[in-house]
């Protein structure tokens, strides 16, 4: 819940000097990206901008305090301020912020700018007291904000110092409007106008000018002088001489003498007590100070000129001028030290009564009241956790004694989930083990079950499947039906365990159950995770179309619940890329992988490993080895600078081994084979993939016998576990083994099996990646004309893809190739004496690549009759009588030129 006063522009007070010269300068603010108002405290920054903002509608105001250094809270108020300025225009961004469904502040701002692109009128966002921000992440995010904000948006920042916002760059590009303390200082005319408004007896212009010069136009000093003059303690000039040369950090003695010592004791105590509140209203004042009519007292303090300012148009919320408020809080610690804990307790109770637990926690911490803090957390901690108030919760839990946590195991569980959310897995188990050791009877019942559900999640994250399964089952046995969150967690973990163990049918049922439970209770991140798991399982089972449809449901969920910036979104677009790659939709697969990298742009580069491997896979399928090599350099750098899950490493190794196969790099393959992990089992698609990498490297090195043993065992496991996609991949690799070993009939047998299975999986690129060896076999099968219709159609499609992406390496008779061929000493004399035309060479290449006459005509964009003429001519020149002889002739020429066909 947001405090309204922090989103309200200060009310323009009576008796303030209208700064016409500065307002004129600000009138052109819409021409700049940033308007920066900087000066020490008390120079009238906020008053000036509130005057400028008067009458403007499209303006949001965000008043910072010390609590806004947390990223999540900063985002909450900033987005609320934008919504205030745009009358709720950025609904998607607001929902993402409220549900904490964004990866970082920069990604949240990126979504904000997408929505603001449809807002065409000038827009202003004011951030007051920016000097209170010390969080470097917020600074970096605001630099991003300024770089990318729409042209019609102007950011107005008020700060006591120069903020870390890339000011120099903006200044050079003339995108910065600056007003500093020299410009903010009152002129002689403004000082005279100020005193005329404040004093019952006006002072002479010359006297006013001398006073103004004595304090260098410092507005707060002028206000203190006027206050002293009204109280008749000193002459205005005497006060000015005393204030001359001092600054905001040396005001304490003066404020004691000239303000606190000149009010009655009741007012003094009111000022000191109320100052502990960062913002205040009638109810808070009544509870904290004991005054019966808080609103009336606030208005009276305001009339006395005691640095109290209204924070909203309704006059409900007030705050002290920051300079005076800090002074009062310091004095309160000295003068009311014994009462201070009780004052903070009263403030906490009042904030709680108004529904602001975060502010209540602030005061409970200040009071050092562990019991009050405990009670607030017991009632509101999980809500704060779900709203990502992690820093506040961590500070609060650290403030509680261990005995208090033991007496309230729910708080131990909360602390453990906090650690889990921060990936501190080792600390989770240590904390829970210590709690179980010290809490009597905790080893049974609901709380123990909740502990086990969390432990199960930690175990599966750590790759410990057996322990995760044991703990998840225990949790589900002990959890009551109403404990939905822990039941969702345990069910999800159990489904993931079965997935890892290859029990796909049972796993699918559990993750579908998880989805239903998560949707029912609005636990959207688990609903999304379950859909991703379902898609992976269906893919492994060979039901790729159903996997696609499940992914569509996941994308719909992301759009409906604004989950675009969760890291899981990257997982979804990555498995979509894998599916698209499988179906040879390479451009779409590449775009999807790149969007995954974009989702992870705010995370460490190591997180992008999987998407980078997918991009390399696309390059390899296209035969673009130069691009693949460039991307592989980056991938290998990431591998050497991070710690990854085994299936991440397996996917990365897959593209490396395929690249070595395509380039014939046996040394790299042999070195990798010596050091790579050899899993104990192959009962899921992760482990199958790593063993396939090993077999591919062995085939490249000519180690056919051990590779065959590996692949036969993989196939046995894949068939028993119904890992149909893995079976399809294994058959293709076994085909390559047989082909290279010269076992042509075995190669044809498993290729026919692979083509038949591909009717179910839809595989295309897995065939294409095998290159010319696959192309030769498919040409032979097509020419035999014995394939069933579906297999025939798929074989032709695969051959077209190979020709499209790989022809330049083995079947494209371009001009340079032909020139080298004709100059080769072993070229047949018939070709030398009766050379083919360039078009006839092209036709020969397409015949060799398996194209029919109609396909050749389409490729070269000529009539079919013209192609027949070209074929007749080239047959005559080559001395061949039919198509198969022409293919064999082309193959001899390619071998002569050094192509391994």
UniProtKB/Swiss-Prot annotation:
SMART domains: HTH_LUXR
Stored SUPFAM superfamilies: C-terminal effector domain of the bipartite response regulators, P-loop containing nucleoside triphosphate hydrolases, TPR-like
One GO term (biological process): positive regulation of DNA-templated transcription
Ranges where the HTH luxR-type domain occurs: 829-894
Regulation: Activated by ATP and maltotriose, which are both required for DNA binding.
The keyword Nucleotide-binding is annotated on this UniProt entry: yes
UniProt: ATP binding residues: 39-46
Coiled coil: none
CDD domains: LuxR_C_like
Origin superkingdom: Bacteria
Keyword presence, Iron: no
DNA-binding region(s) in UniProt: 853-872
Signal peptide interval: none
InterPro entries tied to this protein: P-loop_NTPase, Sig_transdc_resp-reg_C-effctor, TPR-like_helical_dom_sf, TPR_MalT, Tscrpt_reg_HTH_MalT, Tscrpt_reg_LuxR_C, WH-like_DNA-bd_sf
Keywords: Activator, ATP-binding, Carbohydrate metabolism, DNA-binding, Nucleotide-binding, Transcription, Transcription regulation
GO molecular function, one term: DNA-binding transcription factor activity
Pfam families per record: GerE, TPR_MalT
Family: Belongs to the MalT family.
PANTHER family: DNA-BINDING TRANSCRIPTIONAL ACTIVATOR DEVR_DOSR
Protein's job: Positively regulates the transcription of the maltose regulon whose gene products are responsible for uptake and catabolism of malto-oligosaccharides. Specifically binds to the promoter region of its target genes, recognizing a short DNA motif called the MalT box.
Record note on quaternary structure: Monomer in solution. Oligomerizes to an active state in the presence of the positive effectors ATP and maltotriose.
Descriptive protein name: HTH-type transcriptional regulator MalT
Organism of derivation: Shigella flexneri serotype 5b (strain 8401)
């Amino acid at each position: 819940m947001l405090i309204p006063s922090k989103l309200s522009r200060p009310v323009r007070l009576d008796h303030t000097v209208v700064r016409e010269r500065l307002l004129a300068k600000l009138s052109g603010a819409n021409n700049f990206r940033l308007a920066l108002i900087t000066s020490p405290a008390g120079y009238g920054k906020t008053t000036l901008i509130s005057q400028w903002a008067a009458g403007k509608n499209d303006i949001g105001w965000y008043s910072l305090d010390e609590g806004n250094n947390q990223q999540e809270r900063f985002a909450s108020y900033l987005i609320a301020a934008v919504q205030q300025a745009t009358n709720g225009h950025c609904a998607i961004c607001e929902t993402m912020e409220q549900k904490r469904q964004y990866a970082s502040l920069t990604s949240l701002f990126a979504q904000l700018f997408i929505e603001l692109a449809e807002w065409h009128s000038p827009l202003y966002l004011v951030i007051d007291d920016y000097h209170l921000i010390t969080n470097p992440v917020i600074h970096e995010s605001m630099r991003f904000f300024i770089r990318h904000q729409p042209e019609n948006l102007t950011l107005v920042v008020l700060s006591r110092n120069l903020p870390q916002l890339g000011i120099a760059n903006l200044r050079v590009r003339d995108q910065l409007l600056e007003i500093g303390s020299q410009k903010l200082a009152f002129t002689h005319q403004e000082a005279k106008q100020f005193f005329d408004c404040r004093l019952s007896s006006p002072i002479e212009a010359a006297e006013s000018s001398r006073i103004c010069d004595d304090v260098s136009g410092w507005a707060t000093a002028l206000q203190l002088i006027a206050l002293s003059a009204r109280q008749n303690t000193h002459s205005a000039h005497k006060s000015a001489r005393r204030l001359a040369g001092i600054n905001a950090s040396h005001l304490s003695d003066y404020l004691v003498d000239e303000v606190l010592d000149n009010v009655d004791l009741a007012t003094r105590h009111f000022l000191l007590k109320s100052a502990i509140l960062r913002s205040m209203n009638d109810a808070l004042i009544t509870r904290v100070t004991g005054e019966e009519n808080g609103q009336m007292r606030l208005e009276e303090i305001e009339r006395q000129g005691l640095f109290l300012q209204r924070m909203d148009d309704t006059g409900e919320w007030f705050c002290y001028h920051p300079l005076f408020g800090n002074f009062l809080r310091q004095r309160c610690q000295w003068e009311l030290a014994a009462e201070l804990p009780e004052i903070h307790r009263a403030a906490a109770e009042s904030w709680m009564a108004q529904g602001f637990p975060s502010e209540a926690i602030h005061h409970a911490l200040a009071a050092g009241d562990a019991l009050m803090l405990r009670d607030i957390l017991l009632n509101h901690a999980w809500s704060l956790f779900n709203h990502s108030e992690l820093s506040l919760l961590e500070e609060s839990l650290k403030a509680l004694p261990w005995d208090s946590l033991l007496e309230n195991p729910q708080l131990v569980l909360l602390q453990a989930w906090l650690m889990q959310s921060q990936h501190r897995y080792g600390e989770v188990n240590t904390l829970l083990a210590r709690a179980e050791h010290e809490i009597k009877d905790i080893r049974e019942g609901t709380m123990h079950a909740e502990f086990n559900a969390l432990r199960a999640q930690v175990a599966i994250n750590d790759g410990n499947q057996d322990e995760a399964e044991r703990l998840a089952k225990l949790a589900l046995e002990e959890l009551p039906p109403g404990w939905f969150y822990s039941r969702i967690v345990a069910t999800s973990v159990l489904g993931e365990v079965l997935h890892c163990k290859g029990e796909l049918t049972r796993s699918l049922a559990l993750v579908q159950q998880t989805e239903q439970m998560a949707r029912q209770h609005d636990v959207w991140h688990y609903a999304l995770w379950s859909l991703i798991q379902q898609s992976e399982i269906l893919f492994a089972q060979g039901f790729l179309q159903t996997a696609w449809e499940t992914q569509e449901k996941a994308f719909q969920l992301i759009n409906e619940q604004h989950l675009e910036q969760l890291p899981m979104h990257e997982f979804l677009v990555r498995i979509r890329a894998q599916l698209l790659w499988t179906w040879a939709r390479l451009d779409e697969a590449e775009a999807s992988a790149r969007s995954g990298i974009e989702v992870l742009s705010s995370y460490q580069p190591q997180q992008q490993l999987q998407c980078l491997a997918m991009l390399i896979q696309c390059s390899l399928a296209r035969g673009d080895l130069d691009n693949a090599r460039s991307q592989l350099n980056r991938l290998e750098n990431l591998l050497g600078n991070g710690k990854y899950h085994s299936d991440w490493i397996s996917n990365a190794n897959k593209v490396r081994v395929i690249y070595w196969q395509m380039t014939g790099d046996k040394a790299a393959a042999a070195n990798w084979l010596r050091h790579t992990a050899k899993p104990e089992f192959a009962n899921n698609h992760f482990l199958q993939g790593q063993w396939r990498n090993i077999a591919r490297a062995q085939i490249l090195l000519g180690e056919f016998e051990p590779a065959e043993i590996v692949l036969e065992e993989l196939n046995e496991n894949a068939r028993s576990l119904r890992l149909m996609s893995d079976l399809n991949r294994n058959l293709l690799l076994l085909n390559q083994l047989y082909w290279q070993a010269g076992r042509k009939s075995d190669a044809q047998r498993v290729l026919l099996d692979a083509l038949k299975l591909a009717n179910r999986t839809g595989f295309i690129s897995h065939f294409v990646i095998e290159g010319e060896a696959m192309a030769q076999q498919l040409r032979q099968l097509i020419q035999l004309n014995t394939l069933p219709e579906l297999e025939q159609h798929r074989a032709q499609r695969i051959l077209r893809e190979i020709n499209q992406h790989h022809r330049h390496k083995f079947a494209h008779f371009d001009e340079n190739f032909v020139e080298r061929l004709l100059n080769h000493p072993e070229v047949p004399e018939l070709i030398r004496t009766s050379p083919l035309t360039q078009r006839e060479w092209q036709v020969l290449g397409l015949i060799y690549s398996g194209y029919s006459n109609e396909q050749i005509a389409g490729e070269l964009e000529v009539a079919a009759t013209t192609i027949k003429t070209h074929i007749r001519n080239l047959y005559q020149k080559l001395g061949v009588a039919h198509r198969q002889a022409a293919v064999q002739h082309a193959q001899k020429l390619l071998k002569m030129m050094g192509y391994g066909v």
